[in-house]
Curated annotation (Swiss-Prot):
It comes from Filarum manserichense. It is found in: Plastid, Chloroplast. Belongs to the intron maturase 2 family. MatK subfamily. One of its GO terms (molecular function) is RNA binding. Usually encoded in the trnK tRNA gene intron. Probably assists in splicing its own and other chloroplast group II introns. The lineage of its organism: Eukaryota, Viridiplantae, Streptophyta, Embryophyta, Tracheophyta. GO terms for cellular component: chloroplast. It comes from the Eukaryota. Keywords: Chloroplast, mRNA processing, Plastid, RNA-binding, tRNA processing. This is Maturase K.
C-alpha cells in the first residue's frame, strides 16, 4: 500500500492520474492472486494443458505476460486471433483472465486509499462496522417497523447499457486509458452490447468469470443509486438519521464516501426536495433488494415510487419498470428479506378492569414484529439441491452415496446446523423443525441406499446417536450464549436468538 501511495503522489505532482501503468507491475498480479475471490481457484495457477506441469503458482507466467504487453499492438493482435489467443471469450484464455483480475485490483486502488485517508482523519477505526452481522438488521426492524405504516419493496434495476458503469467510474477515476480498457473488456466478452439484461446468462457468466471486478462495478452502481438518500439527509433538517459508515459489501474494503455523492446529486434533486420531507424514513438494503419504510401515508409512498422511477430514467438513462417497486401497508403485508418472511400483525386483546363494584373490559391492540421461515421457498431450495421432491418429501442424495458414512452424516449435519443457526431468530419454529426433518430423513435414505438397506432397519441400527449429530453442536452454542438458563433446551428453541457472527447467507437461503 505504501508503494501505491508513492506512485500516486508522484503521478499527482505531475498533474496526472494514471492507473494504467500499474498494469505492468508484477506486484499488482500478486495482489490479485492473494485476494482469493475467484470461485474456481486463482487464475495464477498454470493450467496443465498449457505448460505440461501440475497446477502450481508461477510468477514466470506473470513476467512473460508483462513482457508481451510491452509489445506494440499486443492487445489488438490477441483479439484478432479468435482461435487460441482471443482476449476475452468462451475459451477463458489464461492471459486475458490474468489481465482482467489485475485490472480489478487497479481500479480499486483510489477507493482503498481514500478509505484509509478518511480513517486516518477520524483517528479511529471502528472494526465493528465491517464485522457487523446480517442479523443486526432484524432487531432494527423489530424496533422500527412496528411503528411504521407503509413500506416500499424495491428491486434495484440493472443498468441496461455498459457505458453507464463506465460513466459512473469516470467521476472517481480520471485515468482515460483505464476507462477505455474497461470498455474493451465489456465489448469483447461474449460480444456484450448490454452488460446486464433480462437474460441472466451474461450477468451470471461475468460474475463467475471475474467476481472481483464484477462486485466492484456493481457496488459502484449501487452507491450511485443510493446517492439520493445521502443528499436528502445532508440537505434537509427534517431527515435526521445517524450514519453508520456501512461498508458496501462485506467481501470488499470500500466505503460510501458521502461528500462525493452529494456533489453528484446536488444539481439534480434540490428542486424536488420539498416533496419528501419525512422524519420517519428508514432505508435498508442487502444485495439487489432494498426496503424504504415510512410513517407517512400511502400517497407519500406513491410520490417516492414515482421519484425513484424518474431518478433511474433521468440519471441512468434507461427505462425502469414501475413493477419493480411495490407499495405495501402494514399489517396486511409480509416482507421477504434476507431469507426471512417478516410481518407486523395486529394482536387484539381484552383486559378486564374492576373498580369498586364496577367492572369493565378494555380492548387493546398491540403490534408485534414476527419473523418466519418461508417454508415454501425453502422446500423449493431443498428440492433444487436434491434433498426432497417438490412436495417436501425427503429423498436420498445419490451423489453423496460414494462417501464414507461419517462424511455423509457430517455434511447433512453441517447443513442442518447452519440453517438452524441462521433461522434461530424465527418467531415460530415449526417450519424449521420440518426442514430438520427433511434433512435428517434424507440423510437416513442416503445411508440406507449406500448399504442397500431399508430406512427403518438403518435407523434402528443407528439409534439415538444419529440424531445427536444434528443437535449437539447447536446445544453447545446455545449454552454458551445463555449459560444461566435453567429450563430444558427444548423450551429454549422457542426463543428468538440473533447471532452477531453471521456475515453471509447460507447457499440454500440464497436461492430464495
Amino acid at each position: 500500500m505504501e508503494e501505491l501511495k508513492g506512485y500516486l503522489e508522484k503521478s499527482r505532482s505531475k498533474q496526472q492520474h494514471f492507473l494504467y501503468p500499474l498494469l505492468f507491475q508484477e506486484y499488482i498480479f500478486v495482489l490479485a492472486h492473494d485476494h482469493g475471490l475467484n470461485v474456481n481457484g486463482s487464475i495464477f495457477y498454470e493450467p496443465a494443458e498449457i505448460s505440461g506441469y501440475d497446477k502450481k503458482f508461477s510468477s514466470l507466467l506473470v513476467k512473460r505476460l508483462i513482457t508481451r504487453m510491452y509489445q506494440q499492438n499486443y492487445l489488438i493482435n490477441s483479439v484478432n486471433d479468435s482461435n487460441q489467443n482471443r482476449f476475452v471469450g468462451h475459451n477463458k484464455n489464461f492471459d486475458s483472465q490474468m489481465i482482467s483480475e489485475g485490472f480489478a485490483v487497479i481500479v480499486e486502488i483510489p477507493f482503498s486509499l481514500r478509505l484509509v485517508s478518511s480513517l486516518e482523519e477520524k483517528k479511529e477505526i471502528q472494526k465493528s462496522q465491517n464485522l457487523r452481522s446480517i442479523h443486526s438488521i432484524f432487531p432494527f426492524f423489530e424496533d422500527k417497523l412496528s411503528h411504521l405504516i407503509c413500506v416500499l419493496d424495491i428491486l434495484i434495476p440493472y443498468p441496461v447499457h455498459l457505458e453507464i458503469l463506465v460513466q459512473i467510474l469516470q467521476c472517481w477515476i480520471q485515468d482515460v486509458p483505464s476507462l477505455h480498457l474497461l470498455r474493451f473488456f465489456f465489448h469483447e466478452y461474449n460480444n456484450w452490447s448490454n452488460l446486464i439484461t433480462p437474460k441472466k446468462s451474461n450477468y451470471y457468466g461475468f460474475s463467475k468469470e471475474n467476481p472481483r471486478l464484477f462486485l466492484f462495478l456493481y457496488n459502484s452502481y449501487v452507491v450511485e443509486c443510493e446517492s439520493i438518500f445521502v443528499f436528502l439527509r445532508k440537505q434537509s433538517s427534517y431527515l435526521r438519521s445517524t450514519s453508520s459508515g456501512t461498508f458496501l459489501e462485506r467481501t470488499h474494503f470500500h466505503e460510501k464516501i458521502e461528500q462525493h455523492l452529494v456533489v453528484l446529486c446536488c444539481n439534480d434533486f434540490q428542486k424536488t426536495l420539498w416533496l419528501f420531507k419525512d422524519p420517519f424514513m428508514h432505508y435498508v438494503r442487502y444485495q439487489g433488494k432494498s426496503i424504504l419504510a415510512s410513517k407517512g401515508t400511502r400517497f407519500l409512498m406513491k410520490k417516492w415510487k414515482s421519484y425513484f422511477v424518474n431518478f433511474w430514467q433521468c440519471h441512468f438513462h434507461f427505462w425502469s419498470q414501475s413493477c419493480r417497486i411495490h407499495i405495501n401497508q402494514f399489517p396486511n403485508f409480509s416482507l421477504h428479506f434476507l431469507g426471512y418472511l417478516s410481518s407486523v400483525p395486529i394482536n387484539p386483546s381484552a383486559v378486564k378492569s374492576q373498580m369498586l363494584e364496577n367492572s369493565f373490559l378494555i380492548d387493546t391492540v398491540t403490534k408485534k414484529f414476527e419473523t418466519l421461515v418461508p417454508i415454501i421457498s425453502m422446500i423449493g431450495s431443498l428440492s433444487k439441491a436434491k434433498f426432497c421432491n417438490v412436495s417436501g418429501n425427503p429423498i436420498s442424495k445419490p451423489v453423496w452415496a460414494d462417501l464414507s458414512d461419517s462424511d455423509i452424516i457430517d455434511r447433512f449435519g453441517r447443513i442442518c446446523r447452519n440453517l438452524s443457526h441462521y433461522y434461530s431468530g424465527s418467531s415460530k419454529k415449526q417450519s424449521l423443525y420440518r426442514i430438520k426433518y427433511i434433512l435428517r430423513l434424507s440423510c437416513a435414505r442416503t445411508l440406507a441406499r449406500k448399504h442397500k438397506s431399508t430406512v427403518r432397519a438403518f435407523l434402528q441400527r443407528l439409534g439415538s446417536e444419529f440424531l445427536e449429530e444434528f443437535f449437539t453442536e447447536e446445544e453447545k452454542v446455545l449454552s454458551l450464549i445463555l449459560p444461566r438458563i435453567s429450563y430444558p433446551l427444548h423450551k429454549l428453541y422457542r426463543e428468538r436468538i440473533w447471532y452477531l457472527d453471521i456475515i453471509r447467507i447460507n447457499d440454500l437461503v440464497n436461492h430464495l
